[in-house]
Amino acid sequence: ALTDLATHNTRVCNAAATAIAWGVAQAMRGEENLDKIVDATIEAAAEGAKYGFSIPSPDIGMRIALACDIVRKAKDDQQALHDLYAMFGGGDLSADSIPSAIALFLLGKGDVKKTLEYCVNFGGDCDTNGAMAGAMVGAMAGIDAVPQVWRDKISEMNACNFSKDADEILALIPQWHVASESDVADLIK
């Protein structure tokens, strides 16, 4: 998540980027418990918020918790979607999009197709929400959980190779580590 420092070096942006990056990392490392992944995103947001310039902004971790509580308390998926949209809308501010994407990930219950359909139909900045929630659920469920027709269409339209890209990312896992204070200090000098 330190990659956002070059262009978005604010506490709120660092919290947002760290939450999504750590959620994806937890899923890639094999965590299958959705609540544990959500909790990890909240903890990561708090850690990321320690770095960058302070600007007036909401607390990303608190908003993730609120969004996920909306999903957990809803009587069904449609109520969850309605209430989530009523609270956060489909906007592109990280204070809205990050909590929404993580809540949509939770609502999809590990089902890639359902999660992405919820994101697309949520409205607003649906491609960004789909990319974030899709990265988390895709990392958890694996490439085979993404319908082949979707992979083919995305590869055709965007000249990308999911399998090659995934293999390259997976090869990096042994090199991952949690950034230390000195790592961050070196980057922002």
Q: Where in this protein do the model-derived segments appear?
A:
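Accessory "access/gating" subregions that flank catalytic or transport cores
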Residues: 24-123
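Catalytic phosphate/nucleotide-handling subdomain of diverse soluble enzymes
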Residues: 1-12, 18-26, 96, 100-182
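Bulky hydrophobic segments
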Residues: 183-189
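Exposed alpha-helical structural elements
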Residues: 36, 40, 59-62, 66, ...
